[in-house]
Amino acid sequence: MLRYTKKGIESKERIGTLPLRMSNLLRYRGVNTPEEAECFLHPRLTDLLDPFTMPGMEKAVSIIRQAVREQWGITIYGDYDVDGICATSIMLETLRDLGAQHVRPYIPSRHEEGYGLNADAIELLAKESRLLLTVDCGITNLDEVALAKKRGMTVIVTDHHQLAEKLPEADAVLNPLIEPYAFKRLCGAGVALKITQALLGMDGVEKRIDLAALATVADIVPLMEENRVIVREGMMRMGTSARPGLKKLMELAQVSQPVNTGHLGFRLAPRLNAGGRLETAEQCVKLLTTKDEAEATAIATHLNGLNQERQAMEKQIVEQAISAIPAQVNFRTDFAIVILGQEWNNGVIGLAAGRICEKYHFPTIVLSQHGDLAVGSCRSIPGVDIHQMLTACKALYQAEGHGQLFERFGGHSQAAGLTIRAELVPELRRLLNRVIPQGDNCDLTCYIPQKEYELEVPLEAVNMALIDELNQLQPTGYGNPNPMLMARGLHVQEARRVGVGGAHLKLTLLDGANVRGGIGFQQGDLADRGYERVDVLFSPEVNEFRGQRTVQLNVAAMKQTGGSLLWPDEKMIFSALLQELTALASNYNTLSSADAQAKILPLRTNQLREKLRLGRGVLMIAHQSAWAKDVLSGGEADTDVGQVRDARAFNTVLFAPDLEKLRDDWRDVVLLDGETLPGLKDLIRQKCPNARLWCLSDAPDDLRKQLSAMTVSEDTLRGLYRRLLRGGTMAASALAQDCGMTEEQVLTGLTVFGQVALVSFKLDPYQLTLLPMHKVALTDSPLRKYLITHYAAETQM
């Protein structure tokens, strides 16, 4: 299921002399005046704010200059992610440029020490350093800062994370969230760059802005205001970087010119992160700061190998976690995916949680059990504050008279980490299912995936000029996304699968005389749908193939115009119906008398629409798309044929179910065609014992008429068999024409022949072979017997 949402309200007023379309795109990004537009579209280094407007900067600069002048021992205490690595590298180079002789980086082990300052490290570092300077951490380490002060250290805390109620009692504290600094969303390396700006001016900034750009993209902070300057200027300088390590890493990651945010976020950042995830991040600092070509090559090559190892490990954990979902998650009742695995790498489970959260659009907690404890990483969706929910779980558990739920936990609205006793993981699931639906700001419709678009454009406007216009918004990323556009009412001239295993969707889209190609990555299954007109969400892009440059639509989503559904092709539905009838016929006589009395409740169409409001838990069994369209009447649901492929139990119209693959995931199962198929409700009850079973009491008899038409006379079937004996083309359409039958009747007859061994017949893909002739009774076919028993009375035999 998918909803389209429009971002903001379009204005009819321009910003200065800018085109109306660009004016609206800028307004959606918080840009409202010509002056703001100039800064946004043409960011310059001179747009960086005065670093001394950040509270604590003057004191920090004074301490650093004294430490360098008096040659104190200095430790830069960082973090093991890309932001912490780059922030550490920036400060290390800055202090060395100032003349510091006794400065060292220290990055804690993710696996042995965890994030932030820790007492053991403080005790060690206090023996050799007089100044402790944190980057990308420390703002919540009140006890550890107090310990460092007690051990005689001078402490400067620089961080960008959320402020606690009380700040650490350091000698200087720098955080852009502290008022009155004008831009709040710098990353840790961005704060380090501001210190460099204060100490060395713009010359120092220009030498290190490449590292700040990499960290800004990797740490997913908004690409607005100062961050926009940092990323744009930093990427420009990467092309001529004097850093041997960065150059070698770019070479191994196949980063070509010009560098873009995708290169930073998806190619360079994972390789740097791999160091901290699997080994130590200090080697990454060495990579970014070394001037030795051989050392740079060795470290970059090693990190590239670690990243490949990390990818394999992540893939394995994701696959194992997804395979555990059926046993550990019930989408009918659960409000979070909570997966417990054994001995997974703690440095990779966060990536796995992110992948699963993105795939299922569900709050996700992936836990790895080590002995009696489980370490977990959480990722969430907009609308569910996972940190708030964990806090509520902790409070509820204590209110119930228990002890501590968590050994430790922390984070923010969309990501968190926790440690819990493994035996309490079932309790965590239970508590989440209580607190999430009761959350103050939780609208349960947030579980329905949404795609947001900014502007609606006609297909004729999707051209090179539009791409050039949108490119003015670069660099794009978090907070400044690549604009998503919508084109309505397009005709699908062609939809086919491409790529390995047909994973991707290749489209030809028309609007009058206007034709554009489209590509939908990981959407190959949409090629099998029946299309009328569609509304498409997309980003325009240039496709280069054999020297030709054309505009194509990078398709993010597609829905039927005027509704939320993409309806299956009628031939697909009939093929599945025939398989369903075959299964029903084979099982019909084995149903017990108790099963044959499975309780089913009447339901009217308007009552069904009320049940669909929550978006989850209703499975609608259908066999004819025209009636299903009437029932839904513009409502929201998924559609599938044979089996439901989405595990999340969104409201779904399932055509002709493969009963063996039906799962007990549903709150309600509704037979849209009424009780037309004897035995169907009984088999559904066996597969879905926890669901309430309904049938529409106002359903038409169209399905019964179709089934009656399929129940042809024995003379007609004999005529079909004689036609097979004559040979010639065996296509169903030709057989139908020669025998005066419909294709549906032919396919039904061939299925009957297959059951009595007159032919070898496969419906999908179509394969037909005559077998040696022998005497048979057609009623020995379970399908034939089922059709005659229930529908022959309405057929003129």
Label each PLM-derived region with a short phrase.
Residues 90, 168-218, 225, 411, ...:
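Short alpha-helices
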Residues 3, 7-131, 151-152, 169, ...:
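Hydrophobic helix-and-loop "lid/oligomerization" segment in the mid-to-C-terminal part
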Residues 671-709:
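Long, low-complexity, charged/polar intrinsically disordered regions in eukaryotic proteins
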Residues 91, 228-270, 274-322, 358, ...:
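Acidic, two-metal ion nucleic-acid-processing modules in DNA metabolism proteins
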Residues 135, 340-343, 621-627, 643-646, ...:
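Structural motif
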Residues 79-80, 108-111, 137-138, 160-163, ...:
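Short, ordered loop/turn segments at secondary-structure junctions
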Residues 123-198, 207, 224:
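Active-site cavity-forming subdomains of large catalytic enzyme subunits
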Residues 364, 665-672:
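A short beta-strand element within the Helicase C-terminal
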